[in-house]
Amino acid sequence: MPQISVVLPVYNVEEYLRQCLDSLANQTFEDFEVICVNDGSGDSSLSILEEYASEDERFKIISQENKGLSGARNTGMDYIKGKYTIFVDSDDWLELNALEKLYNKIIALDSDILMYKFRFFNQDSEQYSESVFTNLEVIDASLENKNFNYRDVSDILFKISHAPFNKLYKTSFLREAGIKFPENLNYEDLYFFYMVFFKTEKVSVFRDESLYNY
């Protein structure tokens, strides 16, 4: 059983997909699987996935008719085998040490959710940037290296990134919570974040460096 399951929805991202897949294939932490959900792509995304899956058995492909981002994530969640789960968007990419850093942190603290820094890449200027929203600096330093819950950050709750991709989740927690992404609903990320956040007493944060690029 892999330690980490990466859920990767894929829909018409041939231009960016190789960069994303390379960032996963070359992780310093190797005990993971990538559940690639081909959500009815009409471009060469599926053939790119098949190329990587033929060379690396950690990449699994599930193809379905288009259900949208939430539907693809939910399908991926049905196939998770790892102890921990991370969501990655297929036009983004991870730093090569991301899974190693996150795994070590969540194991050390035994958290249900580990939130981490991410950054924006401007394709025009080719510059990276962070914001208070992405770097998690709104979370008080007293909560560093410990678990906390939503009550501890209730005054800044709406300033914390609700994106699903900058979090590592304990899979058993997600299953016990029984929460999936709502389909055919706007702001599905927001719904998912608050539903899981309100159900745990064990949230932690990794702010040493940005590990995700979008």
Provide a role label for each language-model segment.
Residues 15-18, 31, 43, 47, ...:
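Residue-level preference for short helical/loop micro-motifs built around acidic side chains
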Residues 85:
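Short aromatic/hydrophobic "clamp" motif used to bind/position activated sugar donors
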Residues 23, 38-48, 65:
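A conserved acidic beta->alpha catalytic loop
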Residues 18-22, 46-50, 82, 95-107, ...:
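Short alpha-helix within the catalytic core of nucleotide-sugar-dependent glycosyltransferases
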